[in-house]
């Protein structure tokens, strides 16, 4: 649902801006409690706006970002919930292979945050199997770098 006063392009711009703001906060080395709360809200707001103007790929990316945020702030149950929502979207739509690798990366990260190393290793292994199949070098490198952060 979007604000009735916003058009499609404005809603897309708002969703993208919120997504980018969330990334700024994720990348910040030290965050205040207020910034962590902002990070949660901006990820959810971005996901909400993409629901009305995006498609399955945008929805999956939004769920992926929500899961990543919850890993960052130490709420593994919420991270797993959003990672599984991402997986559902990816598996029920014809999305590129990098999306499949990405969802397994965030599942691994979420299970790691929950201290379930068996499931974390399983998900990381699946991501590692998919990375060589990603055709675009930049996408392949981005996901490989994210998986490399999983040092359990």
Set out the residue ranges of the language-model regions:
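Amphipathic alpha-helical segments of tetratricopeptide repeats
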Residues: 3-4, 23-24, 43-51, 84-92, ...
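Residue-level signature for tetratricopeptide repeat
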Residues: 24, 49, 69, 103, ...
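TPR repeat positional signature
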Residues: 11, 18, 25, 42-43, ...
